[in-house]
Amino acid sequence: MPLLHRKPFVRQKPPADLRPDEEVFYCKVTNEIFRHYDDFFERTILCNSLVWSCAVTGRPGLTYQEALESEKKARQNLQSFPEPLIIPVLYLTSLTHRSRLHEICDDIFAYVKDRYFVEETVEVIRNNGARLQCRILEVLPPSHQNGFANGHVNSVDGETIIISDSDDSETQSCSFQNGKKKDAIDPLLFKYKVQPTKKELHESAIVKATQISRRKHLFSRDKLKLFLKQHCEPQDGVIKIKASSLSTYKIAEQDFSYFFPDDPPTFIFSPANRRRGRPPKRIHISQEDNVANKQTLASYRSKATKERDKLLKQEEMKSLAFEKAKLKREKADALEAKKKEKEDKEKKREELKKIVEEERLKKKEEKERLKVEREKEREKLREEKRKYVEYLKQWSKPREDMECDDLKELPEPTPVKTRLPPEIFGDALMVLEFLNAFGELFDLQDEFPDGVTLEVLEEALVGNDSEGPLCELLFFFLTAIFQAIAEEEEEVAKEQLTDADTKDLTEALDEDADPTKSALSAVASLAAAWPQLHQGCSLKSLDLDSCTLSEILRLHILASGADVTSANAKYRYQKRGGFDATDDACMELRLSNPSLVKKLSSTSVYDLTPGEKMKILHALCGKLLTLVSTRDFIEDYVDILRQAKQEFRELKAEQHRKEREEAAARIRKRKEEKLKEQEQKMKEKQEKLKEDEQRNSTADISIGEEEREDFDTSIESKDTEQKELDQDMVTEDEDDPGSHKRGRRGKRGQNGFKEFTRQEQINCVTREPLTADEEEALKQEHQRKEKELLEKIQSAIACTNIFPLGRDRMYRRYWIFPSIPGLFIEEDYSGLTEDMLLPRPSSFQNNVQSQDPQVSTKTGEPLMSESTSNIDQGPRDHSVQLPKPVHKPNRWCFYSSCEQLDQLIEALNSRGHRESALKETLLQEKSRICAQLARFSEEKFHFSDKPQPDSKPTYSRGRSSNAYDPSQMCAEKQLELRLRDFLLDIEDRIYQGTLGAIKVTDRHIWRSALESGRYELLSEENKENGIIKTVNEDVEEMEIDEQTKVIVKDRLLGIKTETPSTVSTNASTPQSVSSVVHYLAMALFQIEQGIERRFLKAPLDASDSGRSYKTVLDRWRESLLSSASLSQVFLHLSTLDRSVIWSKSILNARCKICRKKGDAENMVLCDGCDRGHHTYCVRPKLKTVPEGDWFCPECRPKQRSRRLSSRQRPSLESDEDVEDSMGGEDDEVDGDEEEGQSEEEEYEVEQDEDDSQEEEEVSLPKRGRPQVRLPVKTRGKLSSSFSSRGQQQEPGRYPSRSQQSTPKTTVSSKTGRSLRKINSAPPTETKSLRIASRSTRHSHGPLQADVFVELLSPRRKRRGRKSANNTPENSPNFPNFRVIATKSSEQSRSVNIASKLSLQESESKRRCRKRQSPEPSPVTLGRRSSGRQGGVHELSAFEQLVVELVRHDDSWPFLKLVSKIQVPDYYDIIKKPIALNIIREKVNKCEYKLASEFIDDIELMFSNCFEYNPRNTSEAKAGTRLQAFFHIQAQKLGLHVTPSNVDQVSTPPAAKKSRI
């Protein structure tokens, strides 16, 4: 181990508490570790300093590394030292007496170099000059030397062998030494007996000393000195062998003659350092002489005699004289020696001066050199440290995530596995988020009261039920779009500019300059015109239900972009952000997916794949997002978001300010405590001064008082400064919120917040410190406000823009959604390449490691650099191949627990660009995400692979239990069964109403074939007025279907080169489907052919006379026969249904005189005008039903010239229609009601003068569209729903969209009336419904005939036309249900039996029922029924009444609830506010169980008006007029309105939440 400052160096041991994973600094040179860099740095500097010396050679001025190397070399040299020489050399060393090691080394080397010892290996030069390596066996002395023979040592006196170092007999020693020197044997005289070391040479030989030599460098002066340093040490100034070496080699027991046959040498004696400068030998001799003299004198004294004393004195005198002479000689010699010695000393001194000067210069140079080296070392360390700091700085910089070398493995998320295909799960979430954000704007709760969940959306996309949630979703989208477009058209009409201005604006927008946009708009306009040409109304006016939905959706997609015209250019530019045709999402769908639109023309939307359904929903969402109302909605929420963020920032700033104030208050309190302590000390000092003053004189007292005054003033000044400081802080606190409040004045919703913070600021300054409970309450209040603002911000973000939380290293997006809980991961590889997903090494790290390899070992972990320029440039220089894109499907995953979230946050890298931002966001939103994960259900998003019994969500809408299960058959089959039912139903109503008959040989066979699905039995030819007309004729284009391409020019070319082929189908339709569609379309065509022309009205009211142009009816027929899907046939059926004048049916006959439908047995029909007349109402009365033709007084032949023309007839007919649509089912009234009826007749006579067209519009079965302008959500809703036989309708369930249900036929045993009085769905059509459902017919096997019943009043009877020969003219009736037609004798018997059972009871109770006042019967009002009552939909009586009230000119005060902002005291006076929109919503939701509840709400509305508004105000006057109108309309419906109804009103439900 090297010596530090010539002392042993001890290494620093590792700390005892060192952890295995702790990062330390390692010093390689000393093999030590340090926790702190400063200690490591000091040890490195120390190791590089020249303060070390070699422990073996003793060489000083070395670094630690140099000392180690010196020790290593020295030990290697010692290993090569000849072993046979070790003991002889140590023995010889014990004979020396020297104070310096090099002197001993010179003596021993001079003696040993020419002598060779036993067992030593030497080289022998043979006679031929060759060198032979041999081992010495024996040393032979010269032959003349006595005492030695043959190398054996004789026994000699020990004094001659061992040199004694004692001073007992110096004279003998000196003489002996002198003798030995003289007798020393020349070493060249010795001979040596040697033996070769090679095995083949075994003979020994005797050689001379001149023939022997040692190998070169085997024994040298340096090796000997190095060896002696290891075994010697100074003792009392003399170099002696170490005791350990003496004991190890047993030197005291050795005999020199064993090694060499000669006397031991006598070496020169060198005095110890402590006696240097004195002649020790002379002193030693004089002392011996004195001893001898003393002994001589003592002997002489013992023999003293006088004589001998005298002789002795003489001899003494001689000896003294001789001594004096001797002393003189010695003195002379001494003087000469001293002189010589002085000269020698002078020479030595000069030499020493030179040596010292040289040493001084050397040391100075060495010092300068060491200084320069140390400076270089320091500079080197500083540079290393600077590089290290720069390295850390570069390593800590953010970088590309895949360049980080310390990436941890992310926790594996669970893949989403639902019923939906993985590729459309993201789009499903988009639709769900859209409905969640904008559902309130478009009244989503009308279609989905419980909201849309992921399970409902899955069922809509995966299922094929035509009555399922997909139908509801599409109905919601289409009605919302139609309503919004209608509202925008009204606004455009109001704000329309002149033609010139519009033209200028169009040119400015440069819309017409693009031929592609113009062509697309033209094609869309053609598609938009198709419904008007072939169905007689616009697309928005078509009947929208589950059956026609597919075709109307297709037509809407084709017509997208048609509303982009030059007339609304300004409106689009100002309100819709410059919207043009290419911005329409449906047009983009038509251009990008022409096959989907083509498939929709022949396939039902319910049978599309989930991906195709999702594309349609995606396009409809995009369409809604471009609307003005949606844009305004988003802008409102942007303002709300901005305001909420501002309030949140102010709340945070307020919290920070309070924290600063509290900290300042604590500091102020500490300062006050210090001042109090100082005051206390000053008081104590003053007390001491007072005591001193009492002892001292008066002068001293005055001085003490002055000092005390000085102290008092200093304290007072400090107090005043403190008070001023406090006042300044108070004024700042008071000024700050005031100025802040002034800066934000006028911001609504923030005044309360500002007042609250200002009050808190004042309280903080003025009141005492808050207690712990108050502080906790204040903290909770702040947390509550913060939570409310965060929720407000999140809800606003959901309605404006949803961003992902961030992305990780693999570019995966992380999402949280307001609509569904959980943390979702989207793996979207679009736009990525394979090299982007692989780890990338950094060139910076490589460069730094190559320049300084020690840096990496000093850091605790591998470092990473930022630069990637070299890597990026490398492939460009050496490779032309481009990176490959990633082809992986889009995949969604999720984390389901907070533990996985914590693992994710821990694994994200804080140095990556993407992951650092994601980690920060996750930490901020952790509480919100954990709250969502607590509500997360993993089973919904990851189905197990095991088959589940039935995981589909139950989406029942009130279907009958015995109806067919739609999940067991495709939607096409469902629609086919439904269409057959509708065709049979409309044919039966036309036939029973004597409006016509199908032109076939046997009607029963035709119906049986249609009902059983044997379409081949239907006629393949169509007869029109007896002329055979083939099915395929020249037809017009119904479907605008172009073969589009991706490029716009190709799209345009495809549009221009298209040739119209058929009306509505394409060649790719499967033959099986097309045959069914063809047969059913042909059946509908036959039904239309059988209707008499005079019973058709617009749009299919064209006559059969020859015309030069095609009418709507002609185009309708052509389109029908070219239908490619069942939905298209349904659409044509709807148009036909609303074109039939159902009021002319005998099923709806009403007495022209008394305007009542009752007593059908005593009613006859006029053969001229087809109006009904009671036999007892005609003047004169008819006692019997006349035979043959009968004409009313106005139509008698003699007055035929006075009959109204066909153009005027609808005015009278429509008068009946108004009553049909407004009237109830029961006309039983007492005398008071008959008086009211006469007033009603007078009112209707006045109304007869109005335009007939307007009244016809009310009776059209088009769900009130477009003539009755309702909100879109009421379209297609029937007023009542019926319970099927054997099943009670569940409350809260919605009736089936196309279910055919019937009223119960149970007859009350007490009253003989039906248990439930049913309002007919459309009053203009028959009230007959099928009793047996389709599934019942199929399950019973044999084909059964249908039994029809009609909902009638007890006195309603009529006679049948003579053409209806299969119906008994006087068939008995149920009290409320009458059999219309039967098909077999079995049915006739069963119906007749049932009729006879109730005939007597009905007849006996008829009169008493007539005298009784009608009680309101409970009715079941459906919100909207998708089932067709005869194939059409109409408003219920209540809905129509509400619509009439809304359309009235005096309804303006009652349309909506009074605004509390505009009229603050209204709700203080009116406790039960209500308006027409509330009543209409309750009607739509079927909340009215009794008619009296409906009347009570209406009367409550009027009473509120009269209670708040004085009678002379315009609101009260409007209320009076509207109330009178309501009473008249209610009496028409048979509703008994009395003022007492107002008192019976129950508390109305809460008003509908207003739309933003």
Curated annotation (Swiss-Prot):
It is found in: Nucleus. The modification Phosphothreonine is found at T731, T1547. There is a cross-link at K952 (Glycyl lysine isopeptide (Lys-Gly) (interchain with G-Cter in SUMO2)). Residues 306-397, 634-709 form a coiled coil. The keyword Phosphoprotein applies. Residues 1-128 are annotated as: Required for interaction with the CHRAC1-POLE3 heterodimer. Required for interaction with the CHRAC1-POLE3 heterodimer. One of its GO terms (cellular component) is nucleus. GO terms for molecular function: DNA binding; zinc ion binding. Residues 1262-1276 have a biased composition (Basic residues). A zinc finger (PHD-type) spans 1148-1198. The keyword Nucleus applies. It holds the Pfam family DDT. Residues 703-713, 727-736, 1213-1258 have a biased composition (Acidic residues). Highly expressed in testis and at low or undetectable levels in other tissues analyzed. Keywords: Bromodomain, Coiled coil, Isopeptide bond, Metal-binding, Nucleus, Phosphoprotein, Transcription, Transcription regulation, Ubl conjugation, Zinc, Zinc-finger. Residues 842-872, 951-965, 1277-1312, 1363-1374 have a biased composition (Polar residues). The modification Phosphoserine is found at S270, S702, S960, S961, S1281, S1320, S1339, S1353, S1363, S1371, S1402, S1413, S1417. GO terms for biological process: chromatin remodeling; DNA-templated DNA replication; nucleosome assembly; positive regulation of DNA replication; regulation of DNA replication; regulation of DNA-templated transcription; regulation of heterochromatin formation; regulation of transcription by RNA polymerase II. Belongs to the WAL family. PANTHER family: BROMODOMAIN ADJACENT TO ZINC FINGER DOMAIN PROTEIN 1A. Regulatory subunit of the ATP-dependent ACF-1 and ACF-5 ISWI chromatin remodeling complexes, which form ordered nucleosome arrays on chromatin and slide edge- and center-positioned histone octamers away from their original location on the DNA template to facilitate access to DNA during DNA-templated processes such as DNA replication, transcription, and repair. Both complexes regulate the spacing of nucleosomes along the chromatin and have the ability to slide mononucleosomes to the center of a DNA template in an ATP-dependent manner. This is Bromodomain adjacent to zinc finger domain protein 1A. It comes from Homo sapiens (Human). The lineage of its organism: Eukaryota, Metazoa, Chordata, Craniata, Vertebrata.
